[in-house]
Design a protein with these regions (language model features):
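Bacterial Sec-dependent N-terminal signal peptides
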Residues: 1-22
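N-terminal hydrophobic or amphipathic helices/low-complexity stretches enriched
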Residues: 18-77, 98, 204, 280, ...
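Soluble metallo-hydrolase cores and metallopeptidase-like ectodomains found primarily
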Residues: 20-24, 109-145, 216-308, 324, ...
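Noncatalytic luminal/extracellular "stalk/propeptide" segments of secretory-pathway proteins
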Residues: 49-164, 409
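Metal-dependent peptidase/peptidase-like ectodomains
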Residues: 106-107, 220-239, 345-447, 451
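Extracellular/luminal Protease-associated
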Residues: 109-221, 306, 324
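His/Asp/Glu-rich mid-to-C-terminal helical/loop segments that flank catalytic regions of hydrolases
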Residues: 317, 324, 456-511
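Short helix-loop-beta-strand segments that form the rim/entrance of peptidase-like active sites
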Residues: 324-351, 375
Length: 511
């Protein structure tokens, strides 16, 4: 009995010693071009139909990922299931109406209601507050001296010709979604957004999926309208309003008008899933390293498939191949000390839905999750990158945002093993693309989990186009990037201590 007890006591120590002697390069080399191609040509195939959230193609991709995890002997990550399923709510418009001063307007010709925000309501206003372009930032405030609480707000799409913002793209203060958020925070009951794009070439999309929970308040209803509608609301000042606003000649104030907004809808429920496979660790098995990528893309639009090979078939394929490499290490008796969670999430293209759901409903404690290594677009070359070796680089984002340990370790591991050029262009807080906030790692970071986001920088050419296909992937470069991630994950899984969490969270601006 005594000898058996001593042996049992020594087992964790021996496991650690064996791990220290393991050469991770032997297992990193099992990540190959052929394996990556095999997976990516499946994930980004016609059969997957662009993997929209939700869709049958997305479900087929989830089944493929689950089957791969099963074949490796991974443990189901969600209480006996490889799937963590979350609800989606589909709002379908059944009726809409808009009238101003007893003039009824025609849908698509003069207005379109939002199916993303609107709730069933018949709203009547006797006045409206015009707030210019509805922009609020350090340089201008279109709401200055205006009280819009409980009122209808009218704002123009776009921005003044001389407007410049430090933030571009989807989070610019001039973007309609940001303007909507500003009006909501200021208490608007409803919003009219004036657009030049009428009559609409594309009819109203009557259905819109979204992920939501119960809310304390209703979001303001949003109607996008033509210039003819705003002219009826503002009177003489509303004529040729976009031309007049070039000289700021339209007063930002309350205007009297009889306005009725009608909207009704029905809501149905669908579901999407994250796919989670776990490689159990040894003496530190109750601590976790996450390796993530999103397996959804934009789906089909009519008959056109958006294949999403780089975005993010490349990340999904990387997760699958990294899982294979670590499974081979464990089979050889060189398994990790910490458990490694391989998770492919859905709904990223819709607003980071899957990762948000996971971090709000974690299967494994977030305070025991030492790091998330997120892989989103690692298969292409950034054609705008002018310095360095374009065939041996990766953009690294977020390694200095939560933990002061992580960047030092990441660079040391790269120098020792992978020797890939680490480019921090998109890690700059002044980066106008705000990349740090735009992929699934951010949902981990905002819960205090250290993260690294690996990215190729390919924001032009085929980004979010049907031409993002697997034949355009640079598989040799993808292997280099994945081997770097493997070595980094190996270190994260086997070092003695979890990463420190000593840097305050950077809050997004312009959201």
């Amino acid at each position: 009995m005594k000898r058996i007890f001593v042996v049992l006591l020594l087992m964790p120590v021996l496991a650690v010693q064996a791990q220290k002697k393991a050469n991770p390069s032997n297992f990193a080399k099992t990540i190959t071009v052929d394996d990556l191609k095999k997976h990516l040509y499946t994930i980004a195939s016609k059969e997957m139909e662009g993997r929209g959230t939700p869709s049958p193609g997305l479900d087929r991709a989830a089944a493929y990922i689950e089957n791969h995890f099963r074949s490796l002997g991974l443990t189901a990550g969600n209480k006996g299931s490889f799937l963590q399923t979350y609800p989606l709510y589909k709002d379908s418009a059944t009726n809409a109406s808009l009238s101003v001063n007893e003039t009824a307007y025609e849908i698509n010709k003069d207005y379109q209601p939002s199916t993303l925000f609107n709730y069933t309501a018949n709203m009547r206003f006797s006045e409206a507050v015009f707030a210019g372009f509805g922009i609020v930032d350090s340089a201008m405030d279109d709401y200055k001296d205006l009280d819009v609480t409980g009122k209808l707000v009218v704002i123009l799409d776009g921005a003044p010709a001389d407007y410049k913002s430090s933030v571009t793209g989807l989070r610019s203060p001039a973007y309609w979604y940001t303007k909507y958020g500003v009006a909501q925070k200021k208490g608007a009951a409803a919003i009219i957004l004036v657009s030049k794009d009428f009559p609409r070439k594309t009819p109203l999309t009557t259905s819109q999926y979204k992920m939501h929970s119960y809310q304390k308040t209703l979001q303001p209803n949003l109607f996008t309208v033509s210039a003819a509608v705003v002219e009826n609301i503002l009177g003489e000042e509303g004529k040729n309003i976009f031309d007049k606003m070039k000289t700021s000649s339209v007063s930002k104030k309350t205007y009297t008008a009889d306005i009725e907004l009608g909207y009704s809808k029905v809501t149905s429920i669908a579901h999407a899933s994250n796919v989670i496979g776990v490689l159990e660790g040894t003496d530190l098995k109750d601590e976790y390293v996450f390796i993530t990528g999103h397996y959804d893309h934009l789906g089909k639009r009519d008959t056109v498939i958006y294949y999403g090979a780089d975005d993010d078939g490349s990340g999904t394929t990387s997760v699958l191949e990294l899982a294979s490499a670590f499974a081979k290490a464990k089979a050889a008796g060189k398994g990790p000390r910490r458990s490694i969670v391989f998770m492919t999430v859905s709904g990223e293209e819709k607003g980071l839905w899957g990762s948000e759901y996971y971090t709000d409903h974690p299967v494994f404690p977030l305070n025991k999750t030492t790091v998330d290594l997120n892989i989103d677009m690692v298969g292409r070359i950034d054609g705008t990158r002018k310095q360095g070796d374009s065939t041996n680089y990766v953009y690294v984002v977020g390694d200095d945002k939560v933990s002061s340990d992580l960047k030092v370790i990441s660079e040391a591991i790269n120098k020792k093993y992978a020797k890939v050029e680490l480019d921090y262009k998109f890690n700059d807080p002044k980066d106008p693309q705000r990349i740090y906030f735009r992929s699934d790692h951010y949902n981990f970071a905002k819960h205090g989990v250290p993260i690294i986001f690996y990215y190729d920088g390919m924001l032009d050419a085929d980004y979010h186009k049907p031409t993002d296909t697997p034949d355009k992937i640079n598989y040799e470069l993808m292997v280099k990037r994945d081997r770097l991630i493997f070595h980094t994950a190996w270190e994260m899984a086997n070092r003695n201590d979890m990463l420190k969490r000593d840097i305050p969270l950077e809050a997004p601006k312009g959201f």
